[in-house]
Amino acid sequence: MTLVTEVEAQAWLREVLHVDDASMSRLAHLVDLLLAENERQNLVARGTLPHVWVRHIVDSAQLLHVSRETSGSGEWLDLGTGAGFPGLVIAAIQSDRPVTLVDSRRLRTEWLQRAADALELSNVRVILSRVEDLESGAYAAISARAFAPLDKLLAISARFSTPDTLWLLPKGAGAQHELQMLPESWHHMFHVEQSLTDPAAGIIVGRLLAGKQPAPHVSRQQAPRKGKRT
């Protein structure tokens, strides 16, 4: 199934993901904030704005459906979050779940903090940092929306992961190719789910097993430095 219209997208959130009225209200407010801010800085491509519920809200929220985690309490880490997708959407739906949003661009992190404040999302932490400089830690889920090639992403981010950490990585049309570029011994740890918002796009889902860190073919990064918080 591929969602096409804004009506279909909102119906899917309510009927399939069972998003409650309070969360739907927060998502609608987020859309309004995004549309206003996009006039000041290019958060998302203008061509996607007429389909913002499909292209950004459901495209983010589907990670909860793909992971079968419609509820959860473990901290979620969203790397290279940009305009807050998927992390800000996750936080709006699961408002009791801690969500950390990381981006290296000050304008983006300032916007994220303003949006989180406007939505009264006390579960959101915004960090201004490159991923390589971010303080290590263990997270329940890690997302990154088209942030970096899979092998590089795993190399620089494995230190945020345990064998129980769920990775949810929207990758567009190149998802299967990126997975195949990993050594064959890694393939069983990840699989590709089809996106609900684009029939050509895939989401890489899986867990890193113990002893499989960092990712192959990429050198270990220098010791991390603690990132700045906004």
Curated annotation (Swiss-Prot):
Segment forming the signal sequence: none
GO molecular function (one): rRNA (guanine-N7-)-methyltransferase activity
EC number: 2.1.1.170
Keyword Glycoprotein: no
Alphabetical list of InterPro entries matching this protein: rRNA_ssu_MeTfrase_G, SAM-dependent_MTases_sf
Known catalytic reactions: guanosine(527) in 16S rRNA + S-adenosyl-L-methionine = N(7)-methylguanosine(527) in 16S rRNA + S-adenosyl-L-homocysteine
Database matches in SUPFAM superfamilies: S-adenosyl-L-methionine-dependent methyltransferases
Enzyme class: transferase
UniProt keyword annotations, A-Z: Cytoplasm, Methyltransferase, rRNA processing, S-adenosyl-L-methionine, Transferase
Compartments it resides in: Cytoplasm
CDD domains recorded: AdoMet_MTases
GO terms for cellular component: cytosol
Source domain of life: Bacteria
Residues binding S-adenosyl-L-methionine: 80, 85, 131-132, 145
Cross-referenced Gene3D superfamilies: Vaccinia Virus protein VP39
Family as reported in the entry's similarity comment: Belongs to the methyltransferase superfamily. RNA methyltransferase RsmG family.
Function according to Swiss-Prot or TrEMBL: Specifically methylates the N7 position of guanine in position 527 of 16S rRNA.
Identification of the protein by name: Ribosomal RNA small subunit methyltransferase G
